[in-house]
């Protein structure tokens, strides 16, 4: 800590993490390390596969490759530091490191929310307007939608960081979490946080409620279109096209809403921390599995890649 007049500013935070479970620290380290490596391997493999196979150069897989990239950055913003702290007695992070960690985490999380909205629109165009799909989802539009997702997430995060840097931290420096998250930082502030709380609420409404509403409306129209398909095979194919994205969206939003509703208490309970693990660590690992498990095009691309290697 550094002194400045009558105020002692915090220069580092202590991340409580899972230090209240000393008996299972090594087990947790092993589990999180396996999840992290698996997540990186699956997401990066999916990016490479989509890049290498020309049959996957479509809007759907363009969005999916960007989702995998976001998930790699998203999980990497928290897990490496968490793994490092699990092996240390003093689990600390500098003030600057904390701000950078939250900035990356927030940017990627908000960008993912926007990207999932774009992916829902892509599925809407594919199911509801199949004849016009190619003209609607042009390469130019797809690029702008992805850039828009990144820029929106980045801009919103910059606003949050700007507001966060206006606060003073001069009391307790113990964060009862395994990473720097906004609710926990606001609790530690010794200055008024009303403006930051209002801004966070507005951003939550925009990225959470508004995005979820757009996705729900898109899938409402998709559901109506699927019901109009006469053949059972056609309905099944249309449903399978959307099922993976709907599953990923449901997991992302329900877990996120649950974690941030429970964080009103500061995320101090052990249950809150373990619930956050699912939202921040497990979902980035599950996404490539969800999109690939029953995806015939991904399986066919893997077969073509194997044949290419054999030749």
From Swiss-Prot:
Extracellular side: 1-26, 77-100, 156-197, 260-272
Mode of membrane association: Multi-pass membrane protein
Ranges annotated as spanning the membrane: 27-47, 56-76, 101-121, 135-155, 198-218, 239-259, 273-293
Location in the cell: Cell membrane
Residues with glycosylation annotation: 6
Keywords, ordered alphabetically: Cell membrane, Disulfide bond, G-protein coupled receptor, Glycoprotein, Membrane, Olfaction, Receptor, Sensory transduction, Transducer, Transmembrane, Transmembrane helix
One GO BP annotation of this record: adenylate cyclase-activating G protein-coupled receptor signaling pathway
Domain of life of the source: Eukaryota
InterPro entries: GPCR_Rhodpsn (IPR000276), GPCR_Rhodpsn_7TM (IPR017452), Olfact_rcpt (IPR000725), Olfactory_GPCR (IPR050516)
Disulfide bonds: 98-190
Any Gene Ontology CC annotation: plasma membrane
Topological domains annotated Cytoplasmic: 48-55, 122-134, 219-238, 294-311
Molecular function GO labels: odorant binding; olfactory receptor activity; trace-amine receptor activity
Keyword hit for Transmembrane: yes
Family from the record: Belongs to the G-protein coupled receptor 1 family.
Described function: Odorant receptor for musk, which specifically recognizes muscone, musk xylol, and musk ketone. Ligand-binding causes a conformation change that triggers signaling via G(s)-class of G alpha protein GNAL, activating adenylyl cyclase.
Protein name: Olfactory receptor 5AN1
Organism: Homo sapiens (Human)
């Amino acid at each position: 800590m550094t002194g400045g007049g009558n105020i002692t500013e915090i220069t580092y935070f202590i991340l409580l993490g899972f230090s209240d479970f000393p008996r299972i620290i090594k087990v947790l380290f092993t589990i999180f390390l396996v999840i992290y490596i698996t997540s990186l391997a699956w997401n990066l493999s999916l990016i490479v596969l989509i890049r290498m196979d020309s049959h996957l150069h479509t809007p759907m897989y363009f969005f999916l490759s960007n989702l995998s990239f976001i998930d790699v950055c998203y999980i990497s913003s928290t897990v490496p530091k968490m793994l490092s702290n699990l092996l240390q007695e003093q689990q600390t992070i500098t003030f600057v490191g904390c701000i950078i960690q939250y900035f990356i985490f927030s940017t990627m999380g908000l960008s993912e929310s926007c990207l999932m909205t774009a992916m829902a629109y892509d599925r809407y165009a594919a199911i509801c307007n199949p004849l016009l799909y190619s003209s609607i989802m042009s390469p130019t539009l797809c690029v702008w939608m992805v850039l828009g997702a990144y820029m929106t997430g980045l801009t919103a995060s910059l606003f949050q960081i700007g507001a966060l840097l206006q606060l003073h931290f001069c009391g307790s420096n113990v964060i009862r979490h395994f990473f720097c998250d906004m609710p926990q930082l606001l609790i530690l502030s010794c200055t008024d946080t009303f403006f930051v709380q209002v801004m966070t609420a507005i951003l939550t409404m925009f990225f959470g409620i508004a995005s979820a509403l757009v996705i729900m409306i898109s899938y409402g129209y998709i559901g109506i279109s699927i019901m109009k398909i006469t053949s059972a095979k056609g309905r099944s194919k249309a449903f399978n096209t959307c099922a993976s994205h709907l599953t990923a969206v449901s997991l992302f939003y329900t877990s996120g809403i649950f974690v941030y509703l429970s964080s009103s208490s500061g995320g101090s309970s052990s249950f809150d921390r373990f619930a956050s693990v699912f939202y921040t660590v497990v979902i980035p690992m599950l996404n490539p599995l969800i999109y690939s498990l029953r995806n015939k095009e991904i399986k066919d691309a893997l077969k073509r890649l194997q044949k290419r290697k054999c030749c």
